[in-house]
């Protein structure tokens, strides 16, 4: 029946089984591929398995679907979310959707029926080839906000312990005054203040605990987005969604 497509479970089928279906006359044009969702905690599949399965179906030209959880109102009777990946069960859809897309998923569905308006609106900000990282706007100065704005590119030669914006220091802003300095923990976002002279406006995401430096302002904690930040490679683009 060409009006309805058959969907096969991407989480449980390997290439040998897919080849068997093809040998028996399966019409790939009439098939779709979707990963399972897992209501019980600790049963979602791994990122490694997801990418492994996706690489199979990509070879055959399939679009791939997978699920993320809502943190708003979860489906009963278990109420533990409906994700494909276990690692995204307790993560907001904005982040888990990008994690899936980076692994080769084409279509992301919120498994729980009652996602909040904010969760849905946040997902509409996702852009192809740009990581969207949420940031709580707590006591950020106008000058710092000017540095944060727009799209940033991780330098092709980032530091061993930092993600570095190649655009930030070129921004035309007023002086960045010293404030909120202290120990720089992993996943902290920082901007260099006027004390760092020509490095003023340098924007970094810290990838290892580093000591306090009075020349470096701490802007916020991005640890909520650690799954995404760990995927940022040299040359990757990213921007901040101010919560």
Q: Where are the predicted features?
A:
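Hydrophobic beta-strand scaffold residues
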Residues: 4-6, 64
């Amino acid at each position: 029946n060409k009006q309805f497509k058959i969907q096969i479970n991407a989480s449980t089928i390997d290439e040998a089984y897919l080849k068997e279906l093809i040998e028996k006359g399966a019409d790939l044009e009439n098939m779709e591929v979707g990963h399972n969702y897992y209501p019980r905690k600790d049963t979602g599949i791994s990122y490694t398995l997801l990418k492994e399965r996706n690489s199979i179906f990509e070879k055959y030209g399939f679009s791939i679907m997978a699920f993320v959880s809502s943190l708003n109102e979860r489906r009963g009777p278990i109420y533990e979310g409906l994700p494909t990946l276990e690692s995204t069960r307790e993560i907001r859809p904005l982040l888990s959707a990008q994690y899936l897309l980076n692994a080769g998923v084409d279509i992301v569905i919120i498994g729980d029926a009652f996602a909040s308006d904010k969760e849905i609106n946040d997902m509409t900000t996702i852009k192809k080839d740009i990581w969207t990282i949420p940031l709580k706007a707590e006591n950020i100065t106008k000058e710092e906000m000017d540095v944060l704005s727009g799209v940033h590119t991780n330098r092709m030669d980032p530091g061993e312990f930092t993600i570095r914006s190649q655009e930030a220091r070129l921004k035309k802003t007023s002086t960045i005054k010293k404030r909120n300095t202290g120990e720089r923990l992993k996943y902290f976002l920082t901007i260099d203040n006027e004390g760092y002279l020509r490095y003023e406006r340098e924007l970094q995401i810290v990838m290892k605990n580093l000591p306090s430096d009075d020349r470096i302002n701490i802007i916020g904690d991005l640890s909520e987005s650690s799954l995404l930040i760990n995927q940022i490679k040299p040359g990757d683009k990213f921007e901040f969604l101010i919560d």
